[in-house]
Amino acid sequence: MRRKGVRILAIFILICINISIFSRVNADTINVALESEEYAISQKSLTISRIIPKTDIEEFKQQFNLEKEKVHVYAKNGTTEMKNGVIGTGMKICFDNIENEYTACVTGDINSDGEISQYEISKAIKHVVGLEAHQLSGINATAIDVDGDGEITQKDVSILIKYVVYGKLDINGKKTPTAP
């Protein structure tokens, strides 16, 4: 009878240990809601847009509700982690504790160098005048829609030109970006 009591006690202790081990919440697997006051985050298209041209990668990492060590920026190919330089359109953004991979969309940048140049102005003009072979779509259309109104228009071209000539980016003074 005493042996039976010891066995029951041993089984009870093992069950308690297993419950204790398997019921612990591992902080590394909790999904966190991604937030930023600087950038527009789209869960639908998995993009982070409204990134100002020439934004340093370290500065970019500090603009989220996570520690910068938990933000990882990868080259457009998705394999090489970028530790310095500027963020460019098409770069891949991963976060510890968040399953989704996001794509960076720098305002006005479509050649992935993180800047606005005559190349982007030329592409925007060709799109606006309707040249069929030069119509922008996807992340490039989002990048060239610098005023964020959902369309690429002469106003966007004008803003791009002013930026290249004067170095000022006028994007409606938006403090809180909206996702496309």
Q: What are the roles of these predicted feature ranges?
A:
Residues 8-13, 33, 130, 135:
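Acidic/proline-rich low-complexity IDRs
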